């Protein structure tokens, strides 16, 4: 059997990956986000259309039509959004098996947590605070399928405890002022 090869899509930017941590960071200088039980997804919208890409660059545009349609409806020329595709139950909690086995694709949403490019501008060197503001503006009137994964400013251990009590997978902590760097980052922890 021949080894499987993969050509990276044109313009593919690998995601920023959190480093594992024993405990979430606390104190000033950190924000925290709920970690949903889903698939990491990069959503690229440009003149050629909408592409949904896994963290390894595989194309999944046909798998989640609600996300693709919502990205297509955005009133912009181009963007690259980083987030997590999540299937939710009736209470809004993630159900990984529904996502994994593609049950009820109408209930798969993208929880967007970063904006890497916008209208041709590369935002990777911008501070996370700036990227978050732009992401919130971009998705303020987005159709169903795209929503911002809100961040929380509070002690990390408190946020983690509450997230677990509510049935979420955990949290991702991000250092304020950090740029977007592909690969493992010590500015993001989970």
What is each residue range found by the language model?
Residues 1-190:
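Catalytic cores of nucleic-acid ligases and guanylyltransferases
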């Amino acid at each position: 059997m021949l080894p499987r090869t993969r050509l990276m899509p044109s313009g593919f930017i690998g995601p920023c990956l959190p480093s594992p941590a024993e405990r979430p960071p606390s104190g000033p200088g950190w924000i925290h986000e709920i970690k949903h039980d889903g698939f990491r997804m990069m959503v690229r919208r440009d003149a050629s259309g909408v592409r949904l890409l896994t963290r390894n660059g595989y194309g999944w545009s046909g798998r989640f039509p609600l996300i693709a349609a919502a990205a297509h409806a955005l009133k912009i020329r181009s963007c690259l959004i980083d987030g997590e595709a999540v299937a939710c139950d009736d209470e809004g909690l993630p159900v990984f098996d529904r996502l994994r086995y593609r049950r009820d694709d109408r209930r798969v949403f993208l929880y967007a947590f970063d904006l890497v490019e916008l209208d041709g501008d590369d935002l990777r060197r911008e501070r996370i605070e700036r990227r978050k503001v732009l992401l919130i503006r971009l998705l303020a009137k987005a159709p169903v399928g795209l929503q911002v994964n809100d961040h929380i400013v509070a002690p990390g251990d408190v946020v983690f405890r509450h997230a677990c009590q509510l049935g979420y997978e955990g949290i991702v902590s991000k250092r304020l002022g950090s740029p977007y760097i592909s690969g493992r980052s010590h500015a993001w922890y989970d």
